[in-house]
């Protein structure tokens, strides 16, 4: 079976827009914990204890510098608070560039729009009932999911499952970065359209989509998603690109030709356009802080390598933690 969490994490930026419209039912004894809005004291404590997480690069071309950052789409208050080096980079930037602008109501509406006939097959009744049961287990209403492409539905349910381990989509890095940008009145640039985000999930033959939905549904029912999410969160916190690049291992699943084709379509095939969009914003003279899901950063087709091929001097920023002491599988020397 194909790697579970890695299948969905690259497109979770769109899922964040879906989650913004989902009202969580009041938590009961059988519901996953819900994260209450932090108090001012909790925020101040998180700021004082903030450390840098993820992976950050400087990218330099045409005499000025921008930044490239690998994000995660679930988190908690401590994980989400930018550390000192991230704050300095953000403060020096002229614009924030993310996969899609999760704060833009037009973008959010496009992500949540009902699927059309080209966006995924109809879900068989028995599988539909299982998806509804998963939404009930997550203590969220089914209605926001009912008209979405089925693969976007299981991606959102996967993100909700992480709440059992104290990881919540509302603390996804994109929301935190966007909040920082809004507070500074910094422009937010979408690197790709909502349509591209949806196509990343809803493309592929209908029978393969249904097979994928069935596999992820079964994994959610059996509790197999949580260990993979925890492993990804640990690797992201440590900036451990070696582990992240080996997603087939930490996801606990074997690979297959079909799975590899899906990863190529959902992640790496998008990277050239993402790199071109970052390059365009940088060439406009802006110092851009560009952030995408961290799986976009690994391998020969990762964004650091692609930007280097576009003429950038690309250098990993050391956070001085454990993750920086490990060999980087994607060195992009300047």
Give the residues covered by each predicted segment.
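N-terminal signal peptide c-region/cleavage motif recognized by signal peptidases
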Residues: 21-23
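Bacterial N-terminal signal peptides that target proteins for export
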Residues: 2-12
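Short hydrophobic "helix-edge" motifs at membrane interfaces and signal-peptide entry regions
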Residues: 13, 60-63, 283-284
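C-terminal soluble interaction/assembly domains
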Residues: 264-334
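Structured, acidic catalytic/metal-binding patches in enzyme active sites
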Residues: 28-266
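Short, well-ordered alpha-helical scaffold segments within catalytic/effector domains
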Residues: 8, 83, 271-275
